[in-house]
Amino acid sequence: MRAVLLVSGGMDSLVATALAHREGLELAAMHVNYGQRTWQKELECFRQICVHYGIVDRLEVDAMFLSAIGGSSLTDATIPVGPADLAGTDIPTSYVPFRNANFLSMAVSWSEVIGANRIYIGAVEEDSSGYPDCRKVFYDAFNQVIEHGTRPETRIEIVTPLIAMSKAEIVRRGMELDAPFHFSWSCYKSEGKACGVCDSCARRLRAFASVGMDDPVEYEVRPNYLQ
């Protein structure tokens, strides 16, 4: 069976890739550049992950229209990336409006062309309070969209293997699978050293600390987010 992996270069997509690789599937990987602040580092990580898992069939997509639309601190330099607020329930400035729907649409198109039956995405329900397109109900609904919007003989399913996991569980699972976390990047702000203070860095650092492991990525600062 053939599967398309949506690989941002982040921790979650890395572990989703490791899980798909363990299944023995024929893998193809897609990476999307949408004008995010750390696009160069994310692309570098995507390529390193593909080499690590022997993924030859790759597609690097330019989706700069999401940057032109704006509305997110990830794509608009005039909107600052705020400090971590792990207890917050509001939609953060880093939310890219309807981003994952755009990514999935491109992945479905490619899957139809290359005959893939599954699309893996490292979405996590734990993030859904801030990112509505990380909810399980969203992916269930999108599977219906695929069924009704593709050729009758097309059979493509979105697979979200991490959807019910916590970030700590994702790190633990990645360790069990010997996933190369040093080839992943989570920081929203920086491409040299991870900032350590944005929401994504905070969630990652807290997850590694929760399982008693050191994150191999280099940080400007490493606050203790377990306190």
Curated annotation (Swiss-Prot):
* Family per similarity comment: Belongs to the QueC family.
Q: Cite the binding residues for Zn(2+).
A: 187, 195, 198, 201
Q: What is its EC number?
A: 6.3.4.20
Q: Which domain of life is it from?
A: Bacteria
| Cofactor: how bound | Binds 1 zinc ion per subunit.
Family annotation (InterPro entries): QueC, Rossmann-like_a/b/a_fold
Name the source organism: Chlorobaculum tepidum (strain ATCC 49652 / DSM 12025 / NBRC 103806 / TLS) (Chlorobium tepidum)
Q: What is an annotated GO biological process for this record, any one?
A: queuosine biosynthetic process
Q: What does this protein do?
A: Catalyzes the ATP-dependent conversion of 7-carboxy-7-deazaguanine (CDG) to 7-cyano-7-deazaguanine (preQ(0)).
What's the protein name? 7-cyano-7-deazaguanine synthase
Cofactors needed by this protein, per the record, are: Zn(2+)
EC class, as a word, reads: ligase
Q: Which GO molecular function entries does the Swiss-Prot or TrEMBL record give?
A: ATP binding; ligase activity, forming carbon-nitrogen bonds; zinc ion binding
This protein's pathway: Purine metabolism; 7-cyano-7-deazaguanine biosynthesis
Question: Which keywords belong to this entry?
Answer: ATP-binding, Ligase, Metal-binding, Nucleotide-binding, Queuosine biosynthesis, Zinc
Q: Binding positions for ATP?
A: 7-17
What reaction gets catalysed by this protein?
7-carboxy-7-deazaguanine + NH4(+) + ATP = 7-cyano-7-deazaguanine + ADP + phosphate + H2O + H(+)
